[in-house]
UniProtKB/Swiss-Prot annotation:
<dbReference type="GO" id="GO:0005737">
    <property type="term" value="C:cytoplasm"/>
</dbReference>
<feature type="binding site">
    <location>
        <position position="66"/>
    </location>
    <ligand>
        <name>tRNA</name>
    </ligand>
</feature>
<keyword id="KW-0694">RNA-binding</keyword>
<feature type="binding site">
    <location>
        <position position="14"/>
    </location>
    <ligand>
        <name>tRNA</name>
    </ligand>
</feature>
<comment type="function">
    <text>Hydrolyzes ribosome-free peptidyl-tRNAs (with 1 or more amino acids incorporated), which drop off the ribosome during protein synthesis, or as a result of ribosome stalling.</text>
</comment>
<dbReference type="InterPro" id="IPR036416">
    <property type="entry name" value="Pept_tRNA_hydro_sf"/>
</dbReference>
<protein>
    <recommendedName>
        <fullName>Peptidyl-tRNA hydrolase</fullName>
        <ecNumber>3.1.1.29</ecNumber>
    </recommendedName>
</protein>
<dbReference type="GO" id="GO:0072344">
    <property type="term" value="P:rescue of stalled ribosome"/>
</dbReference>
<dbReference type="Pfam" id="PF01195">
    <property type="entry name" value="Pept_tRNA_hydro"/>
</dbReference>
<feature type="binding site">
    <location>
        <position position="112"/>
    </location>
    <ligand>
        <name>tRNA</name>
    </ligand>
</feature>
<dbReference type="GO" id="GO:0004045">
    <property type="term" value="F:peptidyl-tRNA hydrolase activity"/>
</dbReference>
<feature type="active site" description="Proton acceptor">
    <location>
        <position position="19"/>
    </location>
</feature>
<dbReference type="InterPro" id="IPR001328">
    <property type="entry name" value="Pept_tRNA_hydro"/>
</dbReference>
<feature type="site" description="Discriminates between blocked and unblocked aminoacyl-tRNA">
    <location>
        <position position="9"/>
    </location>
</feature>
<feature type="binding site">
    <location>
        <position position="64"/>
    </location>
    <ligand>
        <name>tRNA</name>
    </ligand>
</feature>
<dbReference type="GO" id="GO:0000049">
    <property type="term" value="F:tRNA binding"/>
</dbReference>
<keyword id="KW-0820">tRNA-binding</keyword>
Length: 200
C-alpha cells in the first residue's frame, strides 16, 4: 500500500486557496479513479482506490495544514507503511506557478505542513510539489497562500491536476520519474503567469 496525502485546511473558506492545492489534487484523483467514499479516519478524510494491483490510501488531514503530521503519522502506523511509500501533495512557493516536481526526502523549506509530517515520519517521504510561485516579499507569503488562485491561473491549474490524475497509474506502480515526466509533458508550466493579489 501507498499513502497519498494532500495538504490543506479543511474549513470551507479555505477551499480554493493556493495552500489547498494538495486537497484539490486528491479530490481530482478520487473522482478520476472512482475511489471509495471519503470516511472520517486518522484525524482526516480517507478514501481507498486500487489501480492495477496497487492499493492506495488517499488522505486529507482535517487537522489544519500545520498539524498534518498527526493524521499522516496515524495512517502510516496503522497500515505499517514505510515513509518511502508515502507521497505528500502540497503547494510549493519555490517553484514557478504550474511547475510540478517530485522530490524524495530533504528539508521542509519553511513549509510547516511538511515540517509536521517530518516530525512524525522523519524526512524520507516523497513530496509531490505543485508550484504556486512566490509573492516576492516574505511578509506577503501568508496572505498569498491563504488567498484563492487568480482567474488567470485557473487554466494551468485544471490542466495540471488533470495530468496528475491521468498519470497516477505510474505513481501507483512506483515509477516516480516516469510519473513526473508524463505530468510535465501533459501539462507544461506556463511561461508567464500573473500572480498575487493584483491578479484576481
Amino acid at each position: 500500500m501507498k499513502i497519498l496525502a494532500g495538504l490543506g485546511n479543511y474549513e470551507p473558506k479555505y477551499l480554493r486557496n493556493r495552500h489547498n492545492v494538495g486537497f484539490m489534487a486528491l479530490d481530482i484523483i478520487a473522482q478520476a479513479w472512482n475511489a471509495g467514499p471519503w470516511r472520517k479516519r486518522f484525524q482526516g478524510l480517507a478514501s481507498e482506490v486500487t489501480i492495477g494491483s496497487n492499493k492506495l490510501l488517499l488522505l486529507k488531514p482535517q487537522t489544519f495544514y500545520n498539524n498534518a503530521g498527526n493524521s499522516v503519522g496515524a495512517a502510516a502506523a496503522f497500515y505499517r507503511v514505510k515513509p518511502e511509500d508515502i507521497i505528500v501533495f502540497h503547494d510549493e512557493l519555490d517553484l514557478a506557478p504550474g511547475k510540478f516536481r517530485m522530490k524524495m526526502g530533504g528539508g521542509a523549506a519553511g513549509n510547516n505542513g511538511i515540517k509536521s509530517i517530518t516530525s512524525q515520519l522523519g524526512p524520507d517521504f516523497r513530496r509531490a510539489r505543485i508550484g504556486i510561485g512566490h509573492p516576492g516579499d516574505r511578509n506577503r507569503v501568508t496572505g498569498y497562500v491563504l488567498s484563492d488562485f487568480a482567474k488567470a491561473e485557473e487554466a494551468w491549474l485544471i490542466d495540471l491536476l488533470d495530468a496528475i490524475a491521468g498519470s497516477l497509474d505510474l505513481l501507483a506502480a512506483g515509477d516516480y520519474d516516469a510519473f513526473q515526466t508524463k505530468v510535465t509533458h501533459k501539462a507544461p508550466a506556463p511561461e508567464v503567469v500573473k500572480r498575487g493579489p493584483d491578479a484576481d
